[in-house]
Amino acid sequence: MAKFVFVTGGVVSGLGKGITASSLGNLLKASGLKVFMQKFDPYLNVDPGTMSPYQHGEVFVTDDGGETDLDLGHYERFIDEKLTKMSSTSAGKIYLETINAERRGDWGGQTIQVVPHITDSIKNKVYQAAKTSGADVIISEIGGTVGDIESQPFIEAIRQIRMEQGKENVVFIHVALLLYLNASKEYKTKPIQMSVKELLSLGIQPDIIVQRTDKHSSKEIKEKISLFCNIPTSNVIDAIDKESIYEVPLEMYEQNLHGLVLDQLQIRTKKTDMESWIKFCEKIKASKEEFEVTFVGKYIELQDAYLSVIESLKIAGYEFKRKLKINWIQADKLNESNYKEVLQNAKGILVPGGFGDRGIEGMILASKFARENSIPYLGICLGMQIATISIARDWLNLPEANSTEFDHSGAVPIFDFIRGIDVQNLGGTLRLGAFYKTTIKEGTKAEKLYGSREVFERHRHRYEFNNEYKKALEEKGLVFSGIYEEKKLVEIIELPNHPFFVGSQYHPEFTSRPNKPNPLFKGFVEAIVNNK
């Protein structure tokens, strides 16, 4: 039978509940347990798929095509497991499913209420994850902050789960801010106390408190929190600021977070083996010299919009003992008159995914500059599309070449809607997930990087390359090195006589892991390091 851990947050948002949950998952897996992780978000959007990157950050895509919260990227990177749509649930999805069930008559004329109908639906998501994943421990992060009105059904649901399963099968971890007042030079525990008081009023006694702080707290601070929050002093854990988030599991290991959880859940495991994670962190600390990536994007004001891309670059850099330096370029600031000057010192250029026509011409110029000046280039999804459009304009003498996403007239549609897609709604109209086998052409850079002729990568797009232009571009020297043969969709392009010029229609950033960078990122970083 699965055991359950619930992670809540108090005082303020952005304290690192996701990293705390991920770190615990890392430790439990290192102890020999199978772990599954979930995120419950209190917003009313059905999923993050149509949310603005400026408000939500990146949309992380799972193997089975789930458009999920960016915390799932942390989960997968920390526990090195493929999660599913079941790992991300919003209040909007819960309410939609409940209302649809009522409209179908599933409730037999009952009065539909938050308790029990909404809370039962939330509990079912947790229990279903336990049943289908076969995991020993389910770790569920509750989004938002305790006290928010939107979070209350989730708090009530996990309270009921504890009642149903018993304390020996459920652990509550509360992450809260240990406030430091610079004026008086002292730490204040009152915000944590009030946050726990709020939890207690909702029927939940936390078992472990993780206090976010800049440095380790004193024995006196922990004793005070212990006294007022009804937990042993040993169950007060410091989440201190670290240079790298990947050091946090080791910090939690030193404070025995996993041991506290295992003891309460009455689980006996083998010795926790952190050797591979320690070696990874040693790589990070040994990475002194920088490598620079010029990042030409649409949403650079909020770097979380590209979280997995950034982490993938970092992870690849550590393989060469290099740390990442990013030169951020707003795509819509590049134009014909300034792009050469702006990009003249670029060591490597990356154009990531995105939607809409803003900044497209700037991205096209960035890919053109990389192509013509032998600068390593990696284009992801949109970045692959604009690179192909740029080549078509120059090599086929088609100045009107474009995508129907940006030029609705479709005069020269190098990219067009994926066949069979209904475009009436934005939500649910994308090609999603890793269901599509990419067959890689023999003797190409892609084959060398992957070491395989077949790969499965994750997608998130609604436009595809128009094969009417394939032969003409091949004759000019563009190599279509990866194809989804079933529907003849182009997945990878590359230039053979270039240090590194590769574009993928899929998103390789979603499968990079510590100690296992995605091959495209590793090849891109290696090209930057070696390109003189």
Curated annotation (Swiss-Prot):
Residues 1-267 are annotated as: Amidoligase domain. It comes from Mesoplasma florum (strain ATCC 33453 / NBRC 100688 / NCTC 11704 / L1) (Acholeplasma florum). CTPSs have evolved a hybrid strategy for distinguishing between UTP and CTP. The overlapping regions of the product feedback inhibitory and substrate sites recognize a common feature in both compounds, the triphosphate moiety. To differentiate isosteric substrate and product pyrimidine rings, an additional pocket far from the expected kinase/ligase catalytic site, specifically recognizes the cytosine and ribose portions of the product inhibitor. UTP binds at S13, K188, T189, K190, P191, I192, Q193, K224. It catalyses: UTP + L-glutamine + ATP + H2O = CTP + L-glutamate + ADP + phosphate + 2 H(+); L-glutamine + H2O = L-glutamate + NH4(+); UTP + NH4(+) + ATP = CTP + ADP + phosphate + 2 H(+). ATP binds at G14, L15, G16, K17, G18, I19, D71. CTP binds at S13, D148, I149, E150, K188, T189, K190, P191, I192, Q193, K224. Belongs to the CTP synthase family. It is an enzyme of class 6 (ligase). GO terms for biological process: 'de novo' CTP biosynthetic process; pyrimidine nucleobase biosynthetic process. This is CTP synthase.
